[in-house]
């Protein structure tokens, strides 16, 4: 028996895809490379412990996953999008345009964004101001904006190593990049006074437009080869560092913790990233992790509700659960998430 009332368009969508490709009995999941290892662990455990096939979990980035989720309804579309940043209004608008109107937002826990370099390299004690000063396209100097001319980290902060600046950062399709932009670049931009200069120089029609211009300028990175966008996953960033021992890369905490034999992590504002420092709110560059579920697929794609419930169970996402062993910081409000999943609660409009 179906658990969800189907509209005529949805029935047609499933009928069409079923006749074209046969009934699909495994879950299809895509999105965040940060959430990918957690989702893979859950998917494998789900396949071993339930009477359903192991879900198919792919990466591709948070933005790409949300876009795929919003392509429409039916067996030819994915069921879940993993995301290391919260869904955007533009995603919701795309979903609505394609008939995907009821999404369940599931917060699974927290993760940290870390800066790490070759294990044999020097120690780095960074601040958002340092990172902005090293990687931004423009910096503030003597009350004016100028093109970033820093060549070494010591040029930015004399206390840092006199090592050439080379940073591998997530590309714009990754949810990690959104958090990096806001919590590192934008924070450093404001601390240095560059934000105020960008704001004063904006030709925006109103205050909101000027603020948007200033934020965009804060997020703009240099294009001279010292800040390199990585569109692949963290393994690509790791391989770049292996080939460039003087480089720094941006990773998720869990990936770093699985590669401590190759990487040395930097502190941020004097705090080393760890499950403990993130759970206490001490480490400044952390973020919640999510996945988004098409409610209309529950009761149609076998095992979807069961997978979602299993993912947020105490055994998986709780303190001492399987995912905590791999670096996921448990959500103190996990019980509320579990209740929302059980009730199949759809997300409220974004504020």
Where do the language-model regions lie?
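Gram-negative bacterial Sec-dependent N-terminal signal peptides
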Residues: 1-22
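Flexible loop/hinge segments at secondary-structure junctions
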Residues: 24-351
């Amino acid at each position: 028996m179906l658990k969800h009332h189907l509209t005529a368009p949805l029935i047609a969508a499933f009928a069409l895809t079923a006749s074209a490709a046969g009934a699909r009995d495994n879950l299809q999941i895509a999105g965040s490379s940060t959430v990918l290892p957690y989702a893979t662990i859950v998917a494998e455990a789900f396949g071993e412990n339930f009477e359903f096939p192991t879900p198919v979990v792919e990466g591709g980035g948070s933005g790409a996953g949300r876009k795929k989720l919003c392509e429409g309804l039916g067996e030819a579309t994915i069921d879940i999008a993993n995301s290391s940043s919260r869904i955007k209004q533009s995603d919701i608008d795309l979903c609505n345009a394609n008939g995907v109107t009821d999404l369940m937002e599931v917060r699974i826990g927290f993760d940290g964004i870390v800066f790490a370099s070759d294990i044999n390299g020097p120690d780095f004690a960074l601040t958002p101001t340092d990172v902005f000063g090293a990687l931004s396209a423009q910096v503030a100097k003597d009350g004016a904006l100028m093109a970033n001319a820093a060549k070494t980290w010591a040029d930015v902060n004399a206390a840092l190593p006199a090592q050439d600046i080379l940073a591998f950062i997530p590309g714009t399709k990754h949810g990690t990049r959104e958090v990096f932009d806001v919590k590192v670049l934008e924070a450093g931009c404001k601390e240095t006074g560059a934000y105020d200069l960008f704001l004063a120089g904006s030709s925006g029609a109103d205050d909101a437009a000027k603020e948007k211009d200033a934020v965009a300028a804060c997020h703009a990175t240099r294009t001279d080869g010292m800040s390199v966008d990585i569109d692949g996953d963290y393994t690509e960033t790791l391989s770049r560092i292996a080939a460039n021992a003087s480089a720094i890369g941006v990773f998720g905490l869990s990936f770093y913790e699985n590669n401590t034999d190759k990487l040395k992590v930097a502190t941020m504002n004097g705090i080393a990233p760890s499950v403990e420092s993130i759970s206490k709110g001490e480490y400044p560059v952390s973020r919640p992790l999510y996945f988004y579920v098409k409610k209309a697929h529950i009761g149609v794609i076998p095992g979807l509700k069961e997978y979602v419930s299993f993912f947020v169970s105490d055994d998986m996402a709780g303190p001492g659960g399987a995912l905590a062993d791999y670096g996921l910081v448990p959500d103190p409000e996990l019980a509320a998430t579990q209740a929302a999943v059980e009730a199949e609660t759809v997300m409220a409009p974004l504020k």
